[in-house]
Amino acid sequence: MDIFNILTMIGGLSLFLFGMNIMGESLERRAGSSLRALLGKLTTNRMLGFLTGLAVTAVIQSSSATTVMVVGFVNSGLLTLGQAINVIMGANVGTTVTAWILSLSGIEGSSLIVRLLKPSSFTPVLALVGIIFYMFLKDSRKKDTGMILLGFATLMFGMETMSGAVKGLKDVPQFQQLFLLFSNPVLGTLAGAVLTAVIQSSSASVGILQALSATGQVTYAAAIPIIMGQNIGTCVTAMLSSVGTTKNAKRAAIVHLMFNIIGTVVCLALFSLARALFHPAILGESATYLGISVCHTAFNVICTAMLLPSGNLLEKLVCRMVPDARQPEAVAELDERLLTTPSIALERCRTLTGEMADTAALALGQGLQSLLDFSPELSHSVREDENRTDHYEDILGTYLVKLSALQISEADSAEAAMLLKALNDFERIGDHALNLVESAEELQEKNLSFSEAARHELAVLTRAVGEIVELSFSAFRENDLTKAYQVEPLEQVIDDLKEKLRVHHILRLQQGSCSIETGFVWSDILTALERVGDHCSNIAGCVIDLAHHDMNTHEALRSAQVENENFGEQYRMYAKKYSLKQ
């Protein structure tokens, strides 16, 4: 083996790792909505959690990425430790899918079917289709599909190149001695753990082992301990990601480590015992691509079958290893680790934006109530809720900007932009709730009151504002276009009401039934309520924008009048419903 073989091997390894990386990232983007659906199905059901972990890892081709995601979920309070344990065990089995795909490189034979199954036969076609999709199609999902095909083709080409380059190693005595050394179970396990810890991917390290098996010098006696060690080495990524997290998130990372350590210790003991007592002839045979895939899968399935039923005991063990803090820990509302899976991070942002909307709606409801029946408790509660909406805007705005800077799908990018726009409207509604409370406080402090006619008119307007808030917020939560289109007619009615109330107040001033001081407060209240309607209209516009893939809110609001055939009818219905006639 000369320097050119070494360079070819390095090039093949580089292409292999690069292909695996871009294929995994593209799969993640392409399957974003599916990942969100899987997350939504997570329950305390042990088997469902296990299957979820298996499915997610099979999709994104990385148990490390899944485990880091789980650590982020636990840190954010999305998952309990018990749920996380089930998902982590599923991830360990899901990661074996990659080895089975790579085992296609080891197929040998001259029949037509075998030749069609060999990667060298079909990867050029996949690469051609992939580059056509990527270069000539504009849809981001189709581009991601192209990148998946290109990544897979690059991965398989790198595997073939690496396998061909290492065949010369079979004549190198030092290489033979190295794998003879690794047939020692402890050394083999350490070697597998170190290699995987360095490249931070058990799928990649198993692929490298499969490529090295092409030399014929890798026996099952060496391959099996190395595979066990690879499963321990892959825990490094999750352990590093748990630094600075909550106790439960640290426990989730340690569960991943303990699962693999316990499984390795038990399986290694059984392996050593069987080797000493029975001297199986197969251990001296050269490992194959397929054989390594079988060993990798068997190890993870055995570990899962052994530890899944005792998940509660594993949970108790890590709780003893990482005891609870004396003071309750704050749960991270938005965990940076979730950014490694943008679609999941976006779903978390949507959930928190929904919570922000609930807080703003609560503040506004209390603000409206304070106009009718003021109390210091209401005032204090509204101020707390308004501060909370400010906090939501700060953390979500920063997080969504970071998320938007990542390479995400067109649909996710549009949703992130929609959330960024909606944040400001929810926050401003919280501000206007505070404005209403301040007006109520002024009335209370100065012992002012509105006339009977003014109170009736204000009650009509507040009911209309209450309905538009409920309608627009519901449209946002449910992505309901029907409700979104109903907002603009009601907003027009609110604008008309505000103008009528302003004119009526001027008439009352002229008649002497209202004072100038109450007039200032009246004007402030009308302005706040009218602006709440405007922000609700903007929120509905964001929903329409997202449905039309066009983030021009003003255009969306204009189209709401054009596209909504029932606009005039709905306007008349709302005008009648909120008529000022007693």
For each predicted feature, which ranges?
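Alpha-helical transmembrane segments of multi-pass membrane proteins, especially transporters
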Residues: 13, 33, 37, 41, ...
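Membrane-interfacial helix-loop connectors
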Residues: 69-91, 99-121, 196-233, 242-248, ...
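Cytosolic, long alpha-helical scaffolding segments
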Residues: 79, 105, 218, 244-250, ...
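Alpha-helical transmembrane segments and their lipid-water interface positions
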Residues: 15, 28, 64-68, 95-102, ...
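Hydrophobic core segments of alpha-helical transmembrane domains in multi-pass membrane transport
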Residues: 9-22, 53-57, 125-137, 150-162, ...
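Membrane-embedded alpha-helical segments of transport systems
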Residues: 59-66, 85-102, 119-125, 155, ...
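Short helix-coil transition sites and intra-membrane helix breaks within transmembrane domains
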Residues: 24-28, 56-65, 166-167, 195-204, ...
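Helix-loop-helix hairpins and the membrane-proximal interhelical loops
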Residues: 1-46, 145-194, 212-215
